[in-house]
């Protein structure tokens, strides 16, 4: 494949791995390399990445702010679905990969590149997510996955390669785990976390304080929804990215959104991950409670049956699949009346609902009251119960 490659677009973070990959691509394939970095809320300045990429041999560098697109077109659709993988994981990394891939492919087209490359290892989910997205957009694109080709399979070897080729290397000691951050969450895995019995050290966490160290006074938060999407916090209208950032700030202050789980990777193995998702945790609780007030029972139950499949598709990298499009269209049709406000309380790692209200509410006090009412004839319940018990009574008679 090497002789056929003239130009490659690399998903570039500026870290040791992708800096080595950039130089390795130039040397191994004798090609031009375009470095692409996406700002999806990592919480760090990306402009220095430009100089590092150029120093490592990049012929061009793209640094794109994708935060609003990430939240509006990837996070919010998933939260309209209440998506959660294996009952615990809010899909922070999974949702970012298709956006990065899409923009990477757009740059490849702009640059006339014939290949794309990424820094995902051959053991993880990200290689699948990146490459399924690439191929869904352009089946003819060539893909270079260095971790499946080279023998630089340790940090020591990467450092030696970097020093040999004059690549800027980290001056700080490597952390005993890997992390990945965006506006929705930060994940930690590997290293000391590979032992599922070993608790994470408190100094690892960056988006949230320890619940024990959180304020002793609870804080109320009001979230407004329109058609399933959050649009305001405490009465202030905010853009999607700014709204999620605000909820991250509030949730992190109160120690909300920490999760330590063992999950099933698409490639077949189990892995342990520790996550901080403060804003996402608040948002999911609020959205689900907004739905309880405004969504028809049978629609809600049918939609809920689709959540595991939706989450599995996102987790496994099928964001651009036809079945994903079908599910999203179906789910979005359920959100038309999910409008109103939810009041929550944040306190020492907990997020609980205090109240909810909506002009689209299906909750009627005159029907639900335990006091005397004139709109519900309680005697009607007798026939309802008798008809619904018919098959049970027949079964009982057969067993005698």
From Swiss-Prot:
Signal peptide: none annotated. ATP binds at residues 11-19, 38, 119. GO terms for biological process: argininosuccinate metabolic process; L-arginine biosynthetic process; urea cycle. One of its GO terms (molecular function) is ATP binding. Keywords: Amino-acid biosynthesis, Arginine biosynthesis, ATP-binding, Cytoplasm, Ligase, Nucleotide-binding. Pathway: Amino-acid biosynthesis; L-arginine biosynthesis; L-arginine from L-ornithine and carbamoyl phosphate: step 2/3. This is Argininosuccinate synthase. Homotetramer. It holds the Pfam family Arginosuc_syn_C. It comes from the Bacteria.
């Amino acid at each position: 494949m090497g002789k056929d490659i003239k130009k490659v677009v690399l998903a570039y973070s500026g870290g040791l791995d992708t800096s080595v990959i950039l130089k390795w691509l130039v040397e191994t394939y004798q090609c031009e390399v375009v470095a692409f970095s996406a700002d999806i809320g990592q919480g760090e300045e990306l402009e220095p990445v430009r100089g590092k990429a150029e120093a490592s041999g990049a012929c061009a560098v793209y640094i794109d702010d994708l935060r609003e697109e990430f939240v509006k077109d990837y996070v919010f659709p998933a939260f309209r679905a209440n998506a959660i993988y294996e009952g615990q994981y809010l899909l922070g990394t999974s949702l970012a990969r298709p956006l990065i891939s899409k923009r990477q492919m757009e740059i490849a087209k702009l640059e006339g590149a014939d290949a794309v490359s990424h820094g995902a290892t051959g053991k993880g989910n990200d290689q699948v997510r990146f490459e399924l997205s690439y191929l869904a957009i352009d089946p003819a694109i060539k893909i270079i996955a260095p971790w499946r080709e080279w023998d630089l399979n340790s940090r020591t070897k990467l450092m030696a390669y970097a020093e040999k080729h004059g690549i800027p290397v980290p001056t700080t000691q490597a952390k005993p785990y890997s992390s990945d951050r965006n506006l929705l969450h930060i994940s930690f895995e590997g290293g000391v976390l590979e032992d599922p019995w070993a608790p994470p050290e408190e100094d690892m966490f960056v988006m949230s304080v320890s619940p024990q160290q959180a304020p002793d006074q609870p804080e109320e938060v009001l979230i407004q929804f329109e058609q399933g999407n959050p649009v305001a916090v405490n009465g202030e209208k905010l853009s999607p990215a700014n709204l999620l950032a605000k909820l991250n700030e509030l949730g992190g202050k109160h120690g909300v959104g920490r999760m330590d789980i063992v999950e099933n990777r698409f490639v077949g193995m189990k892995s342990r991950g520790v996550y901080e998702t403060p804003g996402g945790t608040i948002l999911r609780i609020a959205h689900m409670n907004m739905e309880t007030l405004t969504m028809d029972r049978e629609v809600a139950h049918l939609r809920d049956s689709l959540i595991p499949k939706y989450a599995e598709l996102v987790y496994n990298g099928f964001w651009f699949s036809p079945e994903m499009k079908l599910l999203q269209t179906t789910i979005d049709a359920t959100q038309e009346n999910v409008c109103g406000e939810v009041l929550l309380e944040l306190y020492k790692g907990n997020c609980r609902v205090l109240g909810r209200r909506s002009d689209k509410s299906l909750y009627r006090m005159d029907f639900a009251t335990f006091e005397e009412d004139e709109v519900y004839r309680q005697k009607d319940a007798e026939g309802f119960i008798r008809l619904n018990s018919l098959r049970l009574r027949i079964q009982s008679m057969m067993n005698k």
